[in-house]
A protein has these predicted regions:
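N-terminal non-catalytic structural scaffold regions of very large proteins
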Residues: 1-171
Length: 171
């Protein structure tokens, strides 16, 4: 399947014969879906299972994901979170010839998905995306990690620490 925004990075999802779920950003080299999810903030396997449920394809994808192994490598005392390591993996796939750093990887990822000038799924696309993935029911009773700010107005829509109910999720 594909997510093709009005502006911004295309996301293409595919599975292989081993039931591993892959994603391509802007038709670049493929990476494990779980690496993308870890970069989005779902760092642990349990976080991902809570988001998507238990599925043999998801388990196969988590087993293939190199993020955990890479994050645990010794770097002379520098400890990386799973999110940071996932960001670096995505950065290496998108820009293989450039030197990597957590800061540059974070900036690239934010510009790919969080900059309203560069990424826009539009209202209809957002509706279809949320409906197909049942986002409202999946995030029900979760806690908001960071303030959610309306990119057009700068208004804080939801505060960090707030518990999401179905009414909030549908907004």
């Amino acid at each position: 399947s594909q997510i093709i925004p009005n502006r911004g990075a295309w996301l293409e999802y595919e599975t292989d014969s081993n039931d591993i779920i892959w994603v391509r950003l802007d038709r670049a080299r493929k990476l494990c879906l779980t690496a993308l999810l870890r970069a989005l903030g779902y760092e642990t396997d349990d976080d991902i299972r809570n988001l998507l449920g238990n599925d043999k394809r998801l388990e196969a994808t988590m087993a293939k994901d190199a993020t955990v192994a890479e994050a645990s490598k010794d770097r002379g005392g520098a400890v990386r979170t799973l999110r940071e390591q996932a960001l670096l993996i995505i950065y290496k796939k998108q820009k293989p010839d450039e030197p990597e750093s957590v800061e540059s990887a974070t900036n690239m990822f934010k510009s790919l998905f969080y900059d309203p000038k560069r990424y826009d799924v539009m209202r209809v696309g957002r509706y279809k995306f949320n409906k197909k993935l049942s986002i409202a029911t999946r995030i029900n009773k979760h806690i908001i990690a960071e303030d959610i700010i309306d990119p057009r107005t700068g208004e804080v829509m939801f505060r960090a620490g707030q518990v999401i109910d179905l009414e909030t999720a549908r907004r």
